[in-house]
């Protein structure tokens, strides 16, 4: 096979992958504001300066794009958890802080702080809320359930903690989502605010 032809195909594929990634990020931002049914693919296309027909070349339906946005959203949370759990010492408590129930689980504490850091990306958290709201759709519900189950399993494996602690951890995470949706998150998440949000005083 002609080498130039092969290289051209590889380059085209890479370009499409980059466009796909950009498109999904733009979709997260738009879906975060208007939800699955209220969002126009035309507006998403304008965000990344591509044509609407090209959107449907990459994703046959708007729902396909929404499902891809769900995956990207959960992928980013999982990546944050993995990074935090790999080096929990980065999130050690300052001497002036204490935990209401003792030192707690270091890895779980680190993952909580990593999630608090994501609050600066308000659209990411708002999109999660829109994904939950769209669960009346069978495909969306199945995808969200699959990713939520995977996320809780990952957090449990990374922290080696109890079911009760994991339940409390994700309950606080949902509280963070609600706080973010009300716009009550500061521009920069201060240490004291983050500690209070995930159970530290």
Predicted feature locations:
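N-terminal capping/interface segment
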Residues: 1-16, 76-80, 84-104
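Alpha-helical structural segments
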Residues: 22-29, 33, 47, 57, ...
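Alpha-helix C-capping/helix-to-loop hinge sites
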Residues: 34, 84, 114, 131, ...
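Helical hydrophobic small-molecule/effector-binding pocket
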Residues: 75, 90-129, 135-139
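Hydrophobic alpha-helical segments that form the core
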Residues: 122-134, 148-201
